[in-house]
Curated annotation (Swiss-Prot):
GO terms for molecular function: transmembrane signaling receptor activity. PANTHER family: METHYL-ACCEPTING CHEMOTAXIS PROTEIN HLYB, METHYL-ACCEPTING CHEMOTAXIS PROTEIN MCPB. Residues 298-352 form the HAMP domain. This is Methyl-accepting chemotaxis protein PscA. Keywords: Cell inner membrane, Cell membrane, Chemotaxis, Membrane, Methylation, Transducer, Transmembrane, Transmembrane helix.
């Protein structure tokens, strides 16, 4: 069904509609015809059954009237033998009766023809005599096979009264050949038959002589029909049949029914013929509709075929979006063509906008790649300078450690000098010598501290360079974020990377400012140390002069030495603090270097994303270029 064309589907639908319509018509008409025909068959069977029973009734009543006439003649003439011979021996009786007879109350039996009866034959013991002597009128027995002739006969008998006294019973045996001829004449052209049955179910006359005097159950072992007035349909096991029962009226003692049996197939043969004709007509109509609708549908489907070709040209051809369908009608196909043109117009406009956007996206991606390359270069320079700062700070730490060691040695020597001064005047010269050495050490310390001060100044300049680089990185990240915002949805990922770079640059700038602040504090401490060392040198020179002048100043010198010792301890403490600061700066510089490396990695990923974006933009331009706009 999916592989059928639309035209074939329309033809199939039309054929199905016709088939369904004819099928419904056939079913409904078949039902109505069946009901009508069934009613007609029932009516005809009932009429035929009534006519048949009337014929049987007329035949039987005529015989009964003959018997009654004979009995009346016997009653008038008397029951003596001559009178009986004259009354019963009439030719009319012998023509209609197989046997005519009279049985008197004295037991005398007279019949025509005489027949062969035993000498002790007594009619009063016979069933017909007993049934008739007490009956108000003529009685009719059930048919039976006569022993003398072997034919199917029945007996009619009527009481004979003389002066209202029973004189005997007149009777006659009647052959049922005439009734059988009436019944067997109804063969319905070989499609049915008739039979005579009693109300008790005994078959009296039947075309099949084997069933005569048998019960109806033997004729219909399956679905035995109920003997009652009316028409019924049964399935005898051989074929469905219609059977009608009509009672024989007019004779009270003859409770008989005429049964008419008709084959259903023959009764409803007209329906089969009509059904065959209707199916043939349906096939002819379907073929005519297919032959007429085929060319008509092909003509009506031309606009749809044109739209299909136009769509294939757009899909499989050069993608020419400038073509439009010609609208030649205002029906559904015209509306469909107009909708198709409107759809192509919208696609045309969208493709033009996509082409423009793809070109802009390619340009933006190219610029972002250039900016990312520049940022990569700046980041490499920043990493190199950060390594230089780290090396300088390591040197600063080494110098601070050396100052601390010198301060410790100076403190030790001051302690020794104080001990020697306490020993006495004799060691003054040694003290002077020690003071001279101390003065030299202090001078050396001043030089070292001044060198430290100069190096911290260099560190400040390096930090200014780091701050400047961070500011430039921040500006570059800001420019990259602006360019990513212009790129729209395609630059969203790059905007996130640019924002991360800008945050790293800002954090680098903050760390550099903190380092700058620490270095300034270190420079202040170094200047204070220089001042203190200068003062110590001056005091040492005064102490040497005083030592040369007088020994009594030894105590004062000792106190001064102690002061110098305290100052040296302060210098040692300041130097240790400077060492701690330098280590902290070293940690910060290492962290800055790590962050800078992360920034380089992020820039590298950004550059890869930009290259992919540039490739996608080129692919988009290639796809858009496949359409003619």
């Amino acid at each position: 069904m999916k592989n059928l064309g639309f035209s074939k589907k329309i033809l199939l639908a039309a054929a199905l509609i016709v088939v369904v319509a004819f099928s419904v018509f056939i079913v409904i008409n078949d039902y109505r015809q069946r009901q009508s025909l069934k009613s007609s068959v029932k009516s005809e069977l009932q009429q035929l059954g009534t006519l048949t029973t009337q014929n049987i009734q007329t035949w039987l009543e005529s015989r009964i009237q003959l018997l009654q006439s004979m009995s009346q003649q016997v009653a008038v003439d008397g029951k003596e033998l001559p009178q009986l011979q004259r009354a019963i021996g009439l030719p009319t009786y012998s023509d209609n009766f197989q046997l005519s007879y009279f049985g008197s109350t004295e037991g005398v039996m007279f019949s025509v023809p005489a027949g062969n009866r035993p000498a002790d034959y007594d009619p009063r013991a016979r069933g017909w005599y007993k049934a008739a002597q007490n009956a108000p009128g003529t009685i009719v027995t059930e048919p039976y096979i006569a022993a003398s002739s072997g034919k199917l006969v029945m007996t009619i008998a009527t009481p004979v009264k003389i002066q209202n006294q029973l004189a005997g019973v007149a009777g006659a045996d009647i052959s049922l050949d005439s009734v059988s001829k009436i019944i067997n004449s109804l063969n319905f052209d070989g499609h049915g038959y008739a039979f005579l049955v009693s109300a008790e179910g005994k078959i009296l006359v039947h075309p099949d002589s084997k069933l005569v005097l048998k019960n109806i159950n033997e004729a219909y072992p399956v679905n035995t029909p109920k003997i009652a007035t009316g028409v019924t349909e049964i399935d005898s096991g051989k074929q469905p049949e219609i059977i009608s029962f009509t009672p024989v009226q007019g004779v009270a003692t003859a409770n008989w029914y005429v049964a008419l049996v008709l084959e259903q197939d023959s009764a409803y043969a007209m329906l089969t013929e009509f059904r065959t004709s209707a199916i043939t007509a349906m096939v002819v109509v379907v073929m005519v509709i297919i032959l007429l609708l085929g060319p008509l549908i092909r003509v009506l489907m031309q606009p749809l075929h044109q739209m299909g070709r136009a769509m294939r040209d757009i899909a499989d051809g050069e993608g020419d979006l400038t073509k439009r369908l010609a609208i030649t009608s205002h029906d559904e196909f015209g509306a469909l063509a107009e909708s198709f043109n409107h759809f192509v117009e919208r696609i045309h406009t969208s493709i033009r906008e996509v082409a423009s956007t793809a070109a802009q996206l390619g340009e933006v991606a190219t610029r972002v790649v250039k900016v990312s390359n520049a940022s990569m270069s700046n980041s490499d320079q920043q990493a190199n300078r950060t390594e230089s700062v780290a090396a300088a700070i390591n040197e600063l730490g080494a110098a601070a450690q050396e100052i601390a060691q010198n301060a410790a040695r100076t403190s030790q020597q001051s302690s020794d000098a104080s001990g020697l001064a306490s020993d006495g005047q004799g060691v003054v010269q040694q003290t002077i010598k020690a003071m001279n050495e101390l003065s030299g050490k202090i001078s050396e310390s001043c030089v070292n501290i001044e060198s430290l001060n100069g190096k911290t100044a260099n560190i400040g300049q390096i930090l200014e360079v780091i701050t400047s680089i961070s500011q430039q990185t921040n500006l570059l990240a800001l420019n990259a974020a602006i360019e990513a915002a212009r790129a729209g949805e395609a630059g969203r990922g790059f905007a996130v990377v640019a924002d991360e770079v800008r945050n790293l640059a800002h954090r680098t700038q903050d760390s550099a400012q903190q380092v700058q602040k620490m270095i300034e504090e270190l420079q202040v401490g170094a200047r204070e140390a220089v001042v203190n060392m200068t003062e110590s040198q001056r005091q040492s020179e005064d102490s040497v002069g005083i030592a040369n002048l007088a020994g009594e100043r030894l105590g004062s010198v000792t106190r001064r030495i102690e002061e110098i010792n305290g100052m040296n301890q302060s210098v040692a403490a300041a130097t240790e603090e400077q060492t701690s600061v330098v280590e902290s700066i070293n940690v910060d510089i290492t962290h800055i270097n790590t962050l800078n490396q992360q920034g380089v990695d992020n820039l590298r990923q950004t550059l890869e994303a930009c290259n992919s974006l540039e490739e996608q933009a080129a692919r988009l331009q290639q796809l858009v270029g496949s359409f003619r706009i």
